[in-house]
Amino acid sequence: FCINKGMKLQDIRTRTAYNPNALPTQKAAVRAWLGGMSKEFPLSLTLTLKQTIVETNDRGTYRRALTRADCERIARRFTQKLNRQVFGKYAADKCGKSLKYLPVIEGERSNKHLHLHFAIGGLPSHVKFNQFDTLVTNAKLQVEHVDSEHKVDITDSGWIEYITKEVGTKDTDNVLWTLF
């Protein structure tokens, strides 16, 4: 269809299926809720992952594709290692000190290479932003299936929108709520 100058606003809304009375989708609700907390997550991180996992069993060794469960396990392990880098092993493991994380898997719905996006907050005052990249590098070297590339940046206003772009209209499966 074509929108032209002679059309009225109601015609455009009808043709584009705009409904002001429609309930918000899961995607819109999640984005609105997380957007309200975006100031709590001043750092952004993208981690690339190795796309195959080598497994060995009684029949031999084989490669299999990375799955969502693998991504969740890798994210959990990475956050554990990063917490140890930031707070020290004792404080992270025994005292429960942790950064705040909003992890999201990307690539599952779009058939791209699976990778992880994080919005990160709770950085203690003794850790400066320019040190954070080194801490991420050290943590990632201790996690088996994290690839060599990563990107640390200061979160801008569109980061939450960007990392939730694959969240469905009826589900929020891409967000790793268990690590939030």
Put a short name on every predicted segment.
Residues 1-114, 122-180:
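Right-hand nucleic-acid polymerase module
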